[in-house]
């Protein structure tokens, strides 16, 4: 599933994990607890959740989410290929801070980009067009919004197709979408945010079985993890997802890559006996730099 970064072994199309943390980042602002102290000086890289998709044949790369860490994420992504453009497109899931605010770095105060394609659903498009400073990016041609629609295929290269789909989430400013990323040989789901699997009009087990990789919302490990009513910030707990897949084969479980970890989530600990036991069941935990062939 994973492959070496030695150049001659690299496939032509692949996904790169560019971040695995919830919107607020790691360490979390204002957190003085052990969760944000004991691992802070480790060698682990924990950027806000994002994926890169690269096609070496067409010499193109795409970003999924424009996070506050976008500058460092694009620097890492661009190490894999050479192109005259910094990125060939950005796909946004929704209007929460960790998923779109990195667009600001395409503006005149930073890159001063020219017409970077930004793929957005209708409500997200309207949100960006109607609010400053985002509409300045459009007015100055720093970005070019490309409207996409539920379940409609988008061909981004000769070998790659993207399919957006909606998921239930706190849609204060925009709809929330996930993406299916389809390569010539393998495919992946990317669902960094959803309220609960039971609220979706699709069966998550069936959807995972239909792909090779599934990057799934794992914001919290279990109930009671934070000192606030967790129904205010609904997400499927990792323990809930594991329970849903408990009767599935290790091959199915191995498709799952948990992602989008809150700072309190023990999944951020690289050495933890509980996490190790879950890995032994077949599950994966997304780590910066992971690469998976398409």
Predicted regions and their residues:
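Active-site metal-binding motif and surrounding structural segment of the metallo-beta-lactamase
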Residues: 54, 59-119, 212
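A short, active-site helix/loop in glycosyltransferases that binds the activated sugar's phosphate group
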Residues: 123-133
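A short helix-to-beta-strand connector/capping loop
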Residues: 11, 114, 138-144, 157-160, ...
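Bacterial N-terminal signal peptides
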Residues: 1-2
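Core dinuclear metal-dependent hydrolase active-site scaffold
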Residues: 9-79, 145-207, 291-294
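Short, conserved loop/helix-junction motifs that constitute active-site signature segments
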Residues: 82-85, 108-114, 137-139, 205-210, ...
